[in-house]
Amino acid sequence: MKKISILGSTGSIGKQTLDVVRDNRDKFEIVAISANSNIELLLEQIVEFKPKYVTVFEENKALKLKEMLPKNIEIEVLAGMEGLKIISSLDEVDVLLTAVVGMIGLVPTLCAIKKGIDIALANKETLVTAGELVMKEAEKYNVNILPVDSEHSAIFQCLNGENKKNIEKIILTASGGPFRGKKKGELVNITKNEALKHPNWSMGRKISIDSSTLMNKGLEVIEARWLFGVEQENIDVVVHPQSIIHSMVQYTDSSIIAQLGCPDMRLPIQYALTYPDRMESSFERMNFSKFSTLTFEEPDLETFPCLKLAYECLKMGGTYSSVLNSANEVLVSEFLEDKIGFYDIPYYIEKTLEVHSSISEPTLEEILETDRWSRAYVANLIKK
């Protein structure tokens, strides 16, 4: 039985992870869970899955959760970053699933790696901001980094049993988001509610906005570079509106291996939790007669400049990707609060990148300092 700790159990990926566990009680045990502030749902999860530890990032909410707990439930309630670090490095945990949004996942992930705990990674910002550092640590401590993103899970599976020296290119597929086919002039006054309507996937608010700007795909390009050790010029993005092919690998002999399946995040979650094995599931099976046509097109970098910015940051190296990520987090939050427009997101990111003095091969402290600088700088830009 695998023992699991989940960072972000009340979010979209966290809830779907618990769906997988719920259907396979004999295979998995939940040791610890965490949330930012949604203690009502967290309490329901505690009652159902009976973890030994829970962390609430907002300390006042952690105190409130303690008051809400039924007297017959024994659980250690922790708070803040310290709490996340503790539940990420418990001796009894086999797999840490990181499903928190943003930079908050980096330090706990490194804590888990140093304890030799395998990582089921749904928090792409960890590799975007500190990919080189994280992968070196994973190699040092002999830890598996198991991707939960559908695209990276697909590539991971396509590489199984293959020699990485034979990779010619990685091909990440993108749905194109809710605005595929639109031009810039049509998107200037777009609202958050329109941007949140993803055509194929059930996702959280932040990642839904990232999908609408194609920043999500840009972050995935950076993540793929570190996860699979492939240079950026060998990572392509192709828009595939049906989201049936989740990604592909082209080899030096011209062969392409692809991973297909119905759009369901529970599949890559389950694979990450059961790796290197596969486990039966009740997930929907492919009916090829329903998909008589699979289409592909080039991404429109003029309409969706965030993808281009991500490629540029990867090429420049150093801490540029960290600035890209941090600025984007701030700007997406502002957009979701109706404080800025859709195209303010790439505009302010570019302005922040222009003044950044990059650090090559940054330490953890330098990455965290870059994150703080970027957030403060872009917040100040918006105020002006």
From Swiss-Prot:
1-deoxy-D-xylulose 5-phosphate binds at K124, S150, E151, S175, H198, S211, N216, K217, E220. GO terms for biological process: isopentenyl diphosphate biosynthetic process, methylerythritol 4-phosphate pathway involved in terpenoid biosynthetic process. It comes from the Bacteria. Pfam families: DXP_redisom_C (PF08436), DXP_reductoisom (PF02670), DXPR_C (PF13288). Its EC number is 1.1.1.267. Its cofactor is Mg(2+); Mn(2+). It is an enzyme of class 1 (oxidoreductase). Mn(2+) binds at D149, E151, E220. Pathway: Isoprenoid biosynthesis; isopentenyl diphosphate biosynthesis via DXP pathway; isopentenyl diphosphate from 1-deoxy-D-xylulose 5-phosphate: step 1/6. NADPH binds at T10, G11, S12, I13, N38, N123, E125, G204. One of its GO terms (molecular function) is NADPH binding. Keywords: Isoprene biosynthesis, Manganese, Metal-binding, NADP, Oxidoreductase. It catalyses: 2-C-methyl-D-erythritol 4-phosphate + NADP(+) = 1-deoxy-D-xylulose 5-phosphate + NADPH + H(+). InterPro entries: DXP_reductoisomerase (IPR003821), DXP_reductoisomerase_C (IPR013644), DXP_reductoisomerase_N (IPR013512), DXPR_C (IPR026877), DXPR_C_sf (IPR036169), NAD(P)-bd_dom_sf (IPR036291). Belongs to the DXR family. Catalyzes the NADPH-dependent rearrangement and reduction of 1-deoxy-D-xylulose-5-phosphate (DXP) to 2-C-methyl-D-erythritol 4-phosphate (MEP). This is 1-deoxy-D-xylulose 5-phosphate reductoisomerase. It comes from Clostridioides difficile (strain 630).
